[in-house]
């Protein structure tokens, strides 16, 4: 990339993906007035395959592969991701270089009839495509019927409005970003249901040899968010957790200290392995690894081994 070349952002065409791309474009141009930034839109396999559970067709990595190929082939310079959708591994030559300030990491309960999970009647139908949400919902309410829910935010809300579900669970951050917060009947606190790794944060991936771009992106990095997400992702990497596994985590900062809580669950909610750890913020990555190993020793290894065997 030459010093005068425009920055090209690879993005999916969904409203939320475009919001994230425009957010990064605007932040780059605010930090570097006069900088040219273009969007390169594309359709990914994850956008096309809507009739099969994600876990059976490759997980949420389906949403990023085409963007990564575009960067490796020089058709785009960076890609913007919702951190909860980013696989733990990157192709050679690419990496996560910037994490922007985190939005609300909680899940949101959305319904046209009921205000919260407790109000749902026996056998109510709840929509989600997340095994993490499914296992925590079923642990709390084993009577619920969990029904697969795919598509972008608007599509999911449309299916709720068509009467296919009594309620659906979505990421609060996505609804807020799309100015759909009025659809949220209640927030599901981390104490009741742990969010996904990195939920609510936006990350930027680019070629690791693109020194000019990495320098331009520096002002967009949010250190507090980056430390929290680093801790959560280190835990997930050690668990070898893909994006479609029942793993939840949530971290908080307190001055120079960081606290991490995590869980691994059976998809049907019948068994949950939980743990938490705290320590110095500078040791965030090591703390995530330590907690993951504790979870594995406490029973998570058996849950994950069985799950991966079933998905093959």
Curated annotation (Swiss-Prot):
Pfam families, per database record: Porphobil_deam (PF01379), Porphobil_deamC (PF03900)
Co-factor(s): dipyrromethane
GO MF annotation, one: hydroxymethylbilane synthase activity
Transit peptide is among the record's keywords: no
Pathway annotation from the record: Porphyrin-containing compound metabolism; protoporphyrin-IX biosynthesis; coproporphyrinogen-III from 5-aminolevulinate: step 2/4
EC number: 2.5.1.61
Top-rank taxon, per record: Bacteria
Broad EC category: transferase
Keyword Transferase assigned: yes
PROSITE patterns given in the database record: PORPHOBILINOGEN_DEAM
GO cellular component: cytoplasm
GO BP terms in the entry: protoporphyrinogen IX biosynthetic process
Reaction equation(s) it catalyzes: 4 porphobilinogen + H2O = hydroxymethylbilane + 4 NH4(+)
Annotated cofactor note: Binds 1 dipyrromethane group covalently.
Residues carrying S-(dipyrrolylmethanemethyl)cysteine: 243
Keywords: Porphyrin biosynthesis, Transferase
Record family assignment: Belongs to the HMBS family.
HAMAP family with a match to the protein in the record: Porphobil_deam
Subunit comment: Monomer.
Extra facts: The porphobilinogen subunits are added to the dipyrromethane group.
Role: Tetrapolymerization of the monopyrrole PBG into the hydroxymethylbilane pre-uroporphyrinogen in several discrete steps.
Name recorded for this polypeptide: Porphobilinogen deaminase
Organism, scientific name: Vibrio atlanticus (strain LGP32) (Vibrio splendidus (strain Mel32))
Name of encoding gene: hemC
């Amino acid at each position: 990339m030459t010093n005068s070349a425009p920055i090209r952002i690879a993005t999916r065409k969904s409203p939320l993906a475009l919001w994230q791309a425009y957010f990064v474009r605007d932040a780059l141009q605010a930090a570097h007035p006069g900088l040219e930034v273009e969007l390169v839109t594309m359709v990914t396999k994850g956008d096309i395959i809507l009739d099969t559970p994600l876990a059976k067709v490759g997980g949420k990595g389906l949403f990023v592969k085409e963007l990564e190929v575009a960067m490796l082939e020089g058709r785009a310079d960076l890609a913007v991701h919702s951190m909860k959708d980013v696989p733990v591994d990157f192709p050679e030559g690419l990496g996560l270089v910037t994490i922007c300030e985190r939005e609300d990491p909680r899940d949101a309960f959305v319904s046209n009839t009921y205000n919260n999970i407790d109000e749902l009647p026996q056998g109510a139908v709840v929509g989600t495509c997340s095994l993490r949400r499914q296992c925590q919902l079923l642990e709390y309410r084993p009577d619920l019927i969990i029904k697969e829910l795919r598509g972008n935010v608007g599509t999911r809300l449309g299916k709720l409005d068509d009467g296919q579900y009594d309620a659906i669970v979505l990421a609060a951050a996505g609804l807020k970003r799309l100015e759909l917060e009025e659809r949220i009947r209640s927030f599901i606190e981390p104490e009741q249901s742990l969010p996904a790794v990195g939920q609510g944060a936006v990350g930027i991936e680019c070629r690791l040899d693109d020194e000019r771009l990495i320098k331009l992106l520096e002002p967009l990095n949010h250190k507090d968010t980056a430390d929290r997400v680093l801790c959560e992702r280190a835990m997930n990497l050690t668990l070898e957790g893909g994006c479609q596994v029942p793993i939840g985590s949530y971290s908080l900062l307190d001055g120079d200290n960081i606290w991490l809580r995590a869980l691994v669950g059976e998809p049907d909610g019948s068994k949950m392995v939980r743990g938490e750890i705290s320590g110095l913020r500078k040791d965030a990555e090591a703390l995530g690894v330590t907690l993951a190993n504790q979870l594995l020793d406490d029973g998570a290894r058996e849950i994950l081994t069985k799950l991966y065997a079933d998905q093959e």
